[in-house]
Amino acid sequence: MGPCVRFLSLWVGLLCLVSGEVCAQVAHVPPPSRATIPLANIPRVTRAPKLEDYLEHRAREAELKVMDFRQYIPGDGIPASEPTTAYLSYDEKNLYVVFVCHDAPGQVRAHLSPRELLDQDDGVALYLDTFLDRQRAYFFFSNPLGIQEDGIYTEGQGLDTSFDTLWYTQGRVTPDGYIVWFSIPFKSLRFSHAPEQTWGIALYRVILRKSEYDFWPYITQRVQGLAQQFAPVGGLEHVSPGRNMQFIPYGLLAGDRFLNQPSPPNPSTPPAFQSVFEHRAGLDAKFVAKDALTFDVTLNPDFSQVESDDPQVTVNQRFAVFFPEKRPFFIENAGFFQTPVDLFFSRQIADPQFGARMTGKVARWTVGALAIDDRQPGLNQPPGSEYDTRAVDGVVRVAREFGKQSYIGMFASSRDFADTSNRVVSLDGRVTLSQNWVADFQAAHTWTRQDINLPQLCLQFNAPTQTGPNPPNSASQQGNSLFADATYAGRHLNFTTNYVDYSPGFCAELGFIPRVDIRQNNATASYLWRPKSKTIVDFGPVASETVDWDHVGTLQDWATAVALQVDLTHQTTFQLSRGEAYELFDNIPFRKHSTSFMVTTAPYKWLSLNGRFTTGTGENYFPAAPLAPFLGNVKRLNLGFTLRPFSRFRFDETYIYYRLGNREGSTPSGYASDSSIFNNHLMRSKLNYQFTRELSLRLIFDYDATLGNPQLLDFQTNLGSYDGGPVPPAKQFVTDVLFTYLLHPGTAIYVGYNNGLTDLNLDQTLLPPQVVYQRATNNSTSQLFFVKLSYLFRF
C-alpha cells in the first residue's frame, strides 16, 4: 500500500505546484447566496397552450414564467450561458410546461432517436416531487425534437429510467435555439387527494457541447441531494388522477430452432436440434386506489425478446457477473424494493406465470409488496415427483420517512419450492446528518432450508454428512449481514466509506450477493478543482481502497488505487490511474498491480468516443486440471464510438479485448513468457434508423470469441458450463434484427429475427450423437423469429 500513498502524494503535490494560483482562487470561493424560495402558483387555463403559440408569438392565457436558470455544472450558481425561459400552466386534466431555449445557430444537438436513447442530445427536463417529501420525484426529459425519456429520481438511489408512463411532447429547432412543449396527464402521476396541491419542482437544461447543466431554482453541489433544493409550487386546485385503470394485453408468435443439450447430460435424450412454435398471450393490469397506491396484476408477464444484454466479459471471472433486468413488469417501480444491500434481484425469478404487486405512498409511508410464481425450478424434474412443481416468491418493503430526507425501513422476502425455503428479513435506514453528510445502514438475517440432493442456491451450504441407514435429505442454516455507509458530498470534496459483513451462512436466494463470509471496508475520496476556464470543467485526484477478511480473521483481499482525472467541455474526460492489490484465492496469495488510462469525448454533434486501456497482472482463476491457479500478465482494452452522420441514423461500435498471458516466474514451466493463456474478443455493431418518431429499425451484430490454450485454461468452466456438462461455444456470431412501431409506452408492434452462428457441430455419425467443436463459426445453432403486439387501454 505504501507505493500508492506515495503516488497519491506526488500527484497532489504536482497539481498544487502547477496550479497553485488556481487552487488559491477556486478553493475558497464562497457559495452564492441561496435565498429562501417563495411559493409560486401555477395559473389554471381554459385553453391548452400549443407549440405554435410560442413559435408564432401568439397571445396566451396567464402562465408562471421562469427565467433565472443557474449553472449546476461547471459553474455553481452563476447564470446559465444560454438564456432559457419556461412557462407553466394547467387545466383539469394536464400539466403544461413549455421551454423556450436560446442557443447559437447550428449548435443545437438533436437527433430523431428511439425513445430514451438520448445520451448524445441537448434537452430539457422537469422534476416533480408530487408528495413534497424531498425523497423522490418524477423525471420528464425531452430532446429538442420532442423525443422522450422519463424516470423516477430517488435520493440515495439516483435516477431510474426504467419507469415509463404516458405523456406528450412536441419539439422544434428554431434559428435561435429550440422550443419544447410538455403535456403531462394527471392520470400519469401519483399524488395526495388534497383539494390544493403544493409540489416540489425543478426545471433542467443540458447543453452538451459545453458540458453545462442548468437548473431552476438554483441547485448546488455544496448540498447533499437534489430533491430538498426543489422550489415549492402551488396553485394546483381540484386536480386528481381520477379513476385510473389500465390494461395492456399482449400477444406473441414465435418460431425457435436451437441445439438442445440436456443439462445434466442424459444418454436417453442425446443432443439434438429442436424446433418450437410458441404462441403466448398475457395481460398486465393496473389499478390506482386513493390517488397514491398502485396495484399491478400480471398473467404470463411479457418477456423481453426485444431487449439485448450489453456485452460483458464473463471469462475468468471469480464472481457472478451482473446483468440488469429487462422485463417490463419487473423494471417498473423497481425502486420501491431497493435497499442498500441487493436483497431483491428480479432476474432470479426466471419463468413466472402469475404475479401481483402493490406500490405507493400513504402520508410519510412508502410501501411495496410482490407475490409471484416461478416455473423454472421444476422444469427438469421427473413428472409426478415432489419437485414437479413451481416456486412461490414474495417480497414486502415498508419505509417511514422522518426528519429531513431520512427514513427507516423494513424488507422481507420468501421463496418456497417443494420442501425447500428461504426467508430474509432486514432493517435499513438513511439519516441526513447535515447538508453534506448522509449515513445509510442495513442489517439482515436469513433462514434457509435446502434439499441436499438438489443444486444448491446458497454460495455456502453446510450439508450434513451422509452416514447411517437413513441419511437426512435436507438441512437448514442461518446467516446475518451488516452494512453501514457514510458519505460526504460537496462541490470540491467527495468522500464515502462503508463496512459490509456477510456471515458464511447468509443466503438471499432472491438477491444478488456474489460473495459471503467476508468483513469488508471500502473508501473512496476525490478532490476536484473547478477553475474559471472556457475548456476545463474540473480536475483533481481520486483515491480508493478496499480490504476484507473472512470470519476467522484471515486476510482475503486488499486493493488500493489512485488516479488523476481531468474533465473538459464537449463531455471530455481523461483519467490516469494506478492500482496495487492482494488476493487470496484457493488458499494461494497473489500480489497484483494495474495501470490504466481512460478517455471519453463527444467533440462534435455527430461523433462521440470512449476508450480504456489497462495493463497489469491477474490470476488465471480456472486453469486446466491439474494446475493450480497462477498469476499472469493482463491486458484489457475497451473501445467504443458513436456516429450520427444525420439525424435519423445512429451507429454504435463496441470492442472489448481481454488477454491473459504467461508471466515469467508464475506460469508453470515449459511455456514461453507472455505467450497466450487466452484472448477474449467481444465486438458489437449496433445500427438504428428512425423512420419516424414511432417507427425504427435496429440491427445488432455480436461477436464473442475465447481463444485459449487448453493445457492452461479450463474451457468448460470459463465458458459457463462444468466438467461433463453441455459443450459451450468458444466462438459465436449473432445477428439481431428488430422492427419497432412504438406509439407510446404500452402500445407497440415488434417484429424480430435472431440468428446465432457458433463453432459447435452436432456429429450424428457418433452413437449417441455428440456436440463437437469445428474450426469455422458458421453453424446456426439458434434461430428465432417473433412478432409481438401490445396495446394500452386506459380508463
Question: What are the residue ranges of the model-derived segments?
Answer:
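Exposed, low-structure sequence patches enriched in small/polar residues
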Residues: 351, 445-795
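Structural preference for beta-rich elements and adjacent junctions enriched in aromatics
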Residues: 24-401, 409, 419
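Outer-envelope beta-barrel architecture signal
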Residues: 93-95, 136, 178, 195-199, ...
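N-terminal secretory signal peptides that target proteins for export/translocation
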Residues: 1-6
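Bacterial N-terminal signal peptides
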Residues: 8-21
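Surface-exposed extracellular loop regions of Gram-negative outer-membrane beta-barrel proteins
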Residues: 240-295, 393-468, 540-542, 600, ...
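Outer-membrane beta-barrel transmembrane domain signature of Gram-negative proteins
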Residues: 218-241, 377-425, 431-432, 573-637, ...
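Alpha-helix capping and helix-loop boundary segments enriched in small/acidic/polar residues
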Residues: 269-273, 317, 346-349, 382-389, ...
